[in-house]
Amino acid sequence: LEELDAMLRSFCEQIPKDTAVVITADHGMIETSKPRQLILDDCYEKSGSVQFVGGDTRVNYVYLDDSGAIDQVVADLEPFSYAFDAVKTEEAIAANWFGEVLQPAKDRLPELMLLAKSDFTLYHSKYFKARSFDMIAHHGSLSPAEIRVPLIRIGF
């Protein structure tokens, strides 16, 4: 981000005075802190049914070897449920979270999504990059800060 900031500053210093620059993104971010990082490795491994954990630190996509084990996986995660909402993907599809979902897309979706609450971040240390533990801002859940799309205007 520091490099991007420096490049943008340099670019804006060189544009004509009657020119505007508009910058946007596809999502917002939320600031987090190390004490609010939850490493869920033991919970994910307990059932033996978790094949892979993907997504982001604010929304974990949990893929299972056996979709019949979903309730057990949710139960294994219960000690940390204060920090996330566990949403079965079939329920999210039924609630139209994704719009129309065709079978090729369904085949790629996880069985379970964990949506972080407040400023918690959720990790499985095997699947998340080490550098993500040092980041101070994250995205992926449904907080107002994360679903708001930023827009910056420079000039005019």
At which residue positions do the language-model features occur?
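Feature captures the catalytic ectodomains and active-site-proximal regions of enzymes
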Residues: 1-156
